[in-house]
Amino acid sequence: LLTAELTAELTAELTARKSQYEFYRRKLLTFDESIPQLQLRDVASFRNGKGHEKNIADNGKYVVVNSKFISTNGQVIKNSDEQLSPLYFDDIAMVMSDLPNGRALAKCYLIDKDDKFTLNQRIGGFHTLDENIVVTKYLFYILDRNWQLLKYDNGVDQTNLKKDDILNISIPVPAIDVQKRLVYMLDNFDAICSDLNIGLPAEIEARQKQYEYYRDVLLTYAATGKIIAQTDRQTDRQTDKHN
């Protein structure tokens, strides 16, 4: 019961931090009417990916950028032995199809190197046309789960974003120095959230192991009258606390 309560508490903390991040990201990227607006088609090129089902290989050279890869921030990977639709440094990949109320629709991934990634079907690829007008990382933050695209999810049917649905959305274009400042702020906030994503699950696992250890100690003592010998690591940990 105790470990379940701790897990629930830490999971709730993680969820709250994610919600807080989304709130502030939306707030930072909301502009008044004085800021110029351009359509996405005016600031970025677009292409659709290709099917890689026949080219999947465990030891393939290329990472297939599909919806699972993007929705897990690159944690779930499939490889291909062919680069059917190459992606390049600073390309932005976006999920164009998802289940009703899915968390992947319009989620984006920023490509960090050449000759490594290949774009799968139903994933859109974007590249900024002019960095003097729109900074790539700023555009990434604008596009990622953009509310203008999420409105196509009716909560009942599979959502399939069309090319024009995407290219017609409005992109606020503040001054370049403002874009860079926003990127700096969002990068830092994103890093904090990423640390939480790593730290809190690790804390849950540590608490679970701690609970299991003391449970085994108590059960062994109840059954045999003996106490489980501590491991060197546990002894070191207790010694550190007293030093």
Residue ranges and their predicted role:
Residues 1-243:
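Charged, alpha-helix-forming regions
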